[in-house]
């Protein structure tokens, strides 16, 4: 029996060291050299170098002077990141969407874009379609007393056109650019 146990335990120990230590260290080292910004979390910094968030994670922006992200089922917490898992027929989902729609519709800008009412699969999607951001421009312009045309130009400059998929806007990056206007 010892002839089988010793090689098996040795193999388990060897694989634990390789897959649990050597491989992660090698991948981290290569990532730090080749993609240092992404390896460190795609952090977004302000002019003073302070970290304001990650380009990969949505934030809860409050107040009329900011563009708002899409709703989050996990309160924008990375640990509790998840979808709501509520079915379309669930009354709790219908109540939340109706409440959000009523708040957004008060601005009187027409039908509310779906992206401002629905959560993403992770609950932390940092991107919105340009139409959902454009819907918020009159509210932000009024709160900051900035011409609508200036915010539309800011939106056009912040719109990303990925190789695959529709155009998107990173709300954190857009609000970072907006912060340069002051409040």
From Swiss-Prot:
A GO CC term attached to the entry: plasma membrane
An annotated Gene Ontology molecular function: P-type potassium transmembrane transporter activity
Protein's cellular compartments: Cell inner membrane
Topology term for the membrane: Single-pass membrane protein
Pfam families, alphabetized: KdpC
Subunit-level organization: The system is composed of three essential subunits: KdpA, KdpB and KdpC.
Its biological purpose: Part of the high-affinity ATP-driven potassium transport (or Kdp) system, which catalyzes the hydrolysis of ATP coupled with the electrogenic transport of potassium into the cytoplasm. This subunit acts as a catalytic chaperone that increases the ATP-binding affinity of the ATP-hydrolyzing subunit KdpB by the formation of a transient KdpB/KdpC/ATP ternary complex.
Protein name: Potassium-transporting ATPase KdpC subunit
Source organism per UniProt: Pseudomonas putida (strain W619)
């Amino acid at each position: 029996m010892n002839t089988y146990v010793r090689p098996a335990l040795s193999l388990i120990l060897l694989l634990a060291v390789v897959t649990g230590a050597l491989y992660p260290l090698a991948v981290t080292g290569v990532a730090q050299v080749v993609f240092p910004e992404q390896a460190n979390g795609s952090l977004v910094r302000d002019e003073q170098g302070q970290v304001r968030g990650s380009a990969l994670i949505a934030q809860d922006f409050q107040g009329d002077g900011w563009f708002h992200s899409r709703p989050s089922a996990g309160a924008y917490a990375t640990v509790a990141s998840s979808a709501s898992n509520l079915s379309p027929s669930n009354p709790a989902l219908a109540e939340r969407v109706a409440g959000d729609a009523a708040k957004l519709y008060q601005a009187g800008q027409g039908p509310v874009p779906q992206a401002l009412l629905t959560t993403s699969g992770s609950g932390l999607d940092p991107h919105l379609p340009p139409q959902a951001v454009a819907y918020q421009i009159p509210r932000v312009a009024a709160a900051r007393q900035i011409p609508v045309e200036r915010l539309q130009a800011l939106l056009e400059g912040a719109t990303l056109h990925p190789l695959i998929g529709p155009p998107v806007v990173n709300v954190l990056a857009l609000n970072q650019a907006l912060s340069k206007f002051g409040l």
